[in-house]
Amino acid sequence: MARLNELYKNEIVPQLTKDFGYSNIMQVPKIEKIVVNMGLGEAIQNVKILDSAVEELAMITGQKSVITKAKKSIASFKLRQGMPIGCMVTLRREKMFEFLDRLINVALPRVRDFKGVSGKGFDGRGNYSLGIKEQLIFPEIEYDKIDKIKGLNITIVTSARSDEEGKALLKQLGMPFRN
């Protein structure tokens, strides 16, 4: 069992039940899934960029990624409907907890001048999104083998009903918030 999953079941659930006064442990918010997305506008001109992005995302998450396609055509961007413009991975269960553990304890501390993640990334329903400017912070990516620095978006979807509950859950899991 993943370390964070064990921590969640043994320590976080009782703590959050006490803090928010839940009458049932099923009311305690939990992480449902983590979506890692890499949007690549440059893939319109150069399709090879997309191949390396798919490979890097698979190394970071440990799961094969899905290529995302444009929903509609936009002439000013020279974009046609159905063109590949990015890739994404949805993580659940064990892989989700292992990825979150690596993100919090290994990857985020490797960011230059890291003071913590912003507390403003909540959407009003307890889900948290953060952007990472370069994929190099993950130890799985080798500096010599990358052709271009690419950023990625990470969305942590929780069952929390409010931002306050979601932030309390992520803080207990070890997410380093700035404020």
UniProtKB/Swiss-Prot annotation:
GO cellular component: ribonucleoprotein complex; ribosome
Signal peptide: none
GO MF annotation terms: rRNA binding; structural constituent of ribosome; tRNA binding
Keywords, alphabetical: Ribonucleoprotein, Ribosomal protein, RNA-binding, rRNA-binding, tRNA-binding
GO BP term (any one): translation
InterPro entries: Ribosomal_uL5, Ribosomal_uL5_bac-type, Ribosomal_uL5_C, Ribosomal_uL5_CS, Ribosomal_uL5_dom_sf, Ribosomal_uL5_N
Xref: SUPFAM superfamilies: RL5-like
PROSITE patterns noted in UniProt: RIBOSOMAL_L5 (PS00358)
Pfam families in UniProt: Ribosomal_L5, Ribosomal_L5_C
Disulfide bonds: none
Function: This is one of the proteins that bind and probably mediate the attachment of the 5S RNA into the large ribosomal subunit, where it forms part of the central protuberance. In the 70S ribosome it contacts protein S13 of the 30S subunit (bridge B1b), connecting the 2 subunits; this bridge is implicated in subunit movement. Contacts the P site tRNA; the 5S rRNA and some of its associated proteins might help stabilize positioning of ribosome-bound tRNAs.
Family: Belongs to the universal ribosomal protein uL5 family.
UniProt subunit comment: Part of the 50S ribosomal subunit; part of the 5S rRNA/L5/L18/L25 subcomplex. Contacts the 5S rRNA and the P site tRNA. Forms a bridge to the 30S subunit in the 70S ribosome.
UniProt-recorded name of the protein: Large ribosomal subunit protein uL5
Organism, as annotated: Geobacter metallireducens (strain ATCC 53774 / DSM 7210 / GS-15)
Gene: rplE
